[in-house]
């Protein structure tokens, strides 16, 4: 991808991605057995073996300095390699081409590799995310080996990563990829209790439902899953599944999908996974399967995602249960009308809160907030985050500073605050306190350090006194 301008600039891109296990080909002449997956597949076998061997050597060499923490990345002029060992003996490697500026010098084209533009922490997080997404839909590498040996694992890796790697848009990765957080929808207590009551009623009526998650406007309201499992499921829902179905779904905008519902109940509900047509008894369908609690009970579940207007509910049911069209009809008739009413209530409450707060003028600051304890994330910098792109409302130079501040925070355990004045005269502030991180970009060119500090205090008091409920 080239950026417009006098000099051509090329964004970072994926050069190669591979997974290997050195124990699978320990003898000379068996090196190809180590390779479980390699992208791009067109690369000659000898080159694959050479690249894997080099990574193996780097890992072994760095182990001599720190046996428990071998290499995480390798910097070269043209590219950067990232290493991750998600399970013992299994190594994932991602090679990213450094950004390049193509300049004219004395009538000749000169390439300048801008290796400082890449942040290790961002792309290491992307690599870890690749594993977590694979694990969500396929389970662990080790379990595949137990069930069907190395051929089953290779087959699963090929099927998953062949498609998934196409959704990696490395040029738009940033601090949000490091956090991998969850955006929570702010609710008053009464409406939150309505949501809780709805979930309890449905779980009682459909007693085969094991876990439930409730989202509104792509933001989480309630989840019965463990945090780490919900974190990666949330990523899948908001960046892959929901964007496929985006359409105007405001209450009253269209006529109800099923106006014939008894008792004059409106019904906007539909399945986002599973059957498309409930009237066809012969229709073939299947729900995607997910794996949760892989460190403990190792559960395989059907994932049912059902939506009415802007509200979405995920129902997770044990994969051993056979789900029929009749069950889907029962779920549809039970959940559809109730979810439609609840979605309208949430919309009404949300709009009334917005009216009370008033239409304030555009603030002179933008921020990213992250809470490590509950994974709550909030950003006014990102306009949209999908697999295709991340639209940010600030310059790349400022995003880079945010990443640098975050890297500094990682190196120390204590609470701290960092204030930077950018070349463009913006103030960039990072604040780490009690498992929470706040990053603010202030557009106050004439302010001094004391005034900037005061602004940050005001911001914390108004925006972060209570992150989940609006009182």
UniProtKB/Swiss-Prot annotation:
- Output the GO biological process annotations, alphabetical, semicolon-separated: vesicle-mediated transport
Could you tell me which InterPro entries the record lists for this protein? Answer: Ccz1, CCZ1/INTU/HSP4_longin_1, CCZ1/INTU/HSP4_longin_3, CCZ1/INTU_longin_2
CC per GO annotation = intracellular membrane-bounded organelle; lysosomal membrane; Mon1-Ccz1 complex
Main subcellular localisation: membrane
Give the UniProt keywords, A-Z.
Lysosome, Membrane
Pfam families to which the protein is assigned, alphabetical: Intu_longin_1 (PF19031), Intu_longin_2 (PF19032), Intu_longin_3 (PF19033)
- Recorded superkingdom: Eukaryota
The protein's location, in the record's own words, is:
Lysosome membrane
Q: Which family does it belong to?
A: Belongs to the CCZ1 family.
Listed PANTHER family: VACUOLAR FUSION PROTEIN CCZ1 HOMOLOG-RELATED
UniProt name for this protein: Vacuolar fusion protein CCZ1 homolog
What organism does the record attribute this protein to? Xenopus laevis (African clawed frog)
